[in-house]
């Protein structure tokens, strides 16, 4: 007799496992996600351990130690003020990662609120989306430069500028998902059962928008790190005395031939961080995005 194929696509050991556990397992089997996670953990650990694995003084100057090349005493060399670049790059990681994560989380939260409001309350849709379209008409970095220049060089200004630039992207992603979800049978059933708008949104709409929003958040995280470095390079980003990868690169551009290490090491840190987060985002997109699953 012909053996009937099982209608289920999961293996027996997976029965009883929570969706979170199953998703985590699929992510850990994804090569890009694993590589990105390892790289990001290295950067994060270096930033967290900076007070213990450096001299702890990113702004300490020494005229005698100016332009020292990389060596045992100064792993990344010193800059034009004699400051230890190993220390400054690791402390710069704290600033860049914190700003990038803050911008990503704020953009996701505010974008989700705007996107769901536009999709659920259709009378606000045109107004909210026209505002988002107006913001998206400008390249994100140009919008951030304009806002940051207007507000002045402060950490809060950088966060406000970058968040304003990336909110529209999150809002449009959430709105697109919410428009589909509001027409589903289980949402109609919740309406007929007398559920309030807030309950439907928090129980049925928002949870099902989290997957695409999480993917977008990771890419915004990477973009924000690059944008913060750009703003600091231009002198309108993270202000002194805070160490920032972009400002370190800017300080080394006049010495790029004789003291190449000043620009090299923060540039490598920016590249590794952005690459790691993008690899994590690729893994999340492949595992969580149902459209890509169907295409595959």
UniProtKB/Swiss-Prot annotation:
Domain ABC transmembrane type-1: 97-281
Top-level lineage group: Bacteria
Topological type in the membrane: Multi-pass membrane protein
Residue ranges of coiled coil: none
Cell location: Cell inner membrane
Membrane-spanning parts: 35-55, 97-117, 131-151, 205-225, 229-249, 260-280
Function (record text): Probably part of an ABC transporter complex that could be involved in peptide import. Probably responsible for the translocation of the substrate across the membrane.
The protein's name in its UniProt record: Putative peptide transport system permease protein BAB2_1051
Origin organism lineage: Bacteria, Pseudomonadati, Pseudomonadota, Alphaproteobacteria, Hyphomicrobiales
